[in-house]
């Protein structure tokens, strides 16, 4: 534990320094992505306009836990206060990553390497590192992971419920948590944990749903029914065909939920296929994890693989989603961990090349090629993590092999008995 905390103390100043480097970083006035939207939601709430009833909100209710606190510093300081809050989430995540590795008995070298890489991640994430609220659910997922490893199962499920209320993606981690707790503590503990998850999520959502049930439903529905977002894997293949003159891509700006989607029958079909692939990718991780020899040691790997599958094949992709992956990927050890970190870093850096040239991407120009490479890197990341997970599954011998081994064992025992009898009669 002391080694873990020392590693975190060393990494935190590095992290804060890295947060100040990108455009829109810590101590910088510029802001990007959706930060102005967060401020608008928070200020309208304080002015008496209720979210989901008077104002359409595209984010889950749990997001207001980080939208509202920066308003305490005034409208003119919301930008700096929000970035500071996200930096604090990052600091807490570094501490938790160190504690997770300490729980797993990681070596000092691996521990320092993991927190060091996490500390440098704002350089690769760029402006999105502090200008979106994704550091909040990312922190909660690592906290839940640590609690599960500490056998604080009910608290772990409760934190997952809070994470789901802030961003829906942690739902893919729930079956993994159920498998882990079931194999260690039995189904009753799983039931209690799931009850805690539902209770926490309900406590967060209920106040909003009480006065605006239709608005909350519309917020979730609008997200679920989004089309093929331009940065998704499926869209990148259609954009490639467009560049080759084999397809006429049409990019449209969506209302309500801000974004740029591809429109048309082909795009709709690819979006449907993406949902199927995403479900299969995540379910594959669940099945493989259910068969691992050591569920405790492999839980961080399974968390990383499930989130990677969710992101790689989704029909809606935004670059800030990669912030969910970083603290989980650095927990993966061995050769797979090195490969996973390298692929994640490459995907992050590549996305920064066109970050300030999104207009060119929406006009279907040169960033299309880089987009395809980035998306394929994420597919490769998923493959690496699933490959590592599959190598740790329980090997169940077939009945024929079992019978053959049993027969050989009986034959060996018979010959041993004969040999001993001959020796005694002599």
Language model regions located:
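Multi-pass membrane glycosyltransferase architecture that uses lipid-linked
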Residues: 1-221, 268-426
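N-terminal leader/capping segments at the start of a protein or of a new domain
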Residues: 222-226
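Extended ligand-binding clefts on enzyme/binding-domain cores
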Residues: 227-235, 268
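Extracytosolic (periplasmic/ER-lumenal) interhelical loops and adjacent juxtamembrane/interface segments
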Residues: 39, 43-44, 52, 56, ...
